[in-house]
Each structure stands twice: as structure tokens, then as C-alpha cells.
Amino acid sequence: MFKSINPATGHVIETYSPLSANAANLLVGNAGSAAKAWAQVDVDTRAAMLERLALLLESRLEDYAQLITREVGKPLVEARSELGKCALLCRYYAAHAPGFLAEEQVNAAAKQSYLSYQPLGVVL
């Protein structure tokens, strides 16, 4: 059993059963299938999802801040600040990802050379 414990109070927040090897393998396989599908999603759609994530973090900021405080023991003001930074980071990558991931032509001996960024898939 795994327990999530509030470090400030010692109160058990939740108890989790460990996964069997079969269940873990199934989850990794599902993640691999999802990664292949996700790799087909264009960068503008992904950027829009990051923007939606920023909005979600902001709309649920207090709930998530309370959860961080309970599970990690971080002061509430710091948890709120951390979530605000996460929302800003989502917006930053939403705005800049198309440029970061664009193919780049490079000078090389070959007739045509370029850098192309491709998803790695599931990383454990």
C-alpha cells in the first residue's frame, strides 16, 4: 500500500494499492498508443491545448493550491504562486512552440539538410 500523508499533520489523505505487473504493462501500452495518436496532432492544436491548460490552472487555482499544501506541506501562498508560474509557462510554450518546433534548414555537404523535431513517445 502507498499512502499520501499530509506532512504537517501526519493525516493520511489517501491510500493506494500497488499495480500488478500486468496492470502496469497495460498502462504503458495504452500510453504508447496514445503517444502515437498525439504525434499526429499539429503544433497549433497542441498550443491551443496548452492555453486551455493555463485557463484550467487559473480557474481551479485555489483547489490545486489546497491539494499541494495538503500533500507536500508547501505554504498556501507558495502553492498559489507555483500554480501561477505553471499557467504562465503553459502560455509561454503555447505562444512559442510553433517557432521552437519548426523545421530548420542547416548548411551541410548534403544537397538539402534540415533539423526536424519529432516526438519521442513514452519515456519512463
Indicate residue ranges for each PLM-predicted region.
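N-terminal Rossmann-like NAD(P)+-binding subdomain of aldehyde/semialdehyde dehydrogenases
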Residues: 1-114
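Structural motif
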Residues: 87, 120-121
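Solvent-exposed alpha-helices and their adjacent loops that cap or buttress functional pockets
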Residues: 115-119
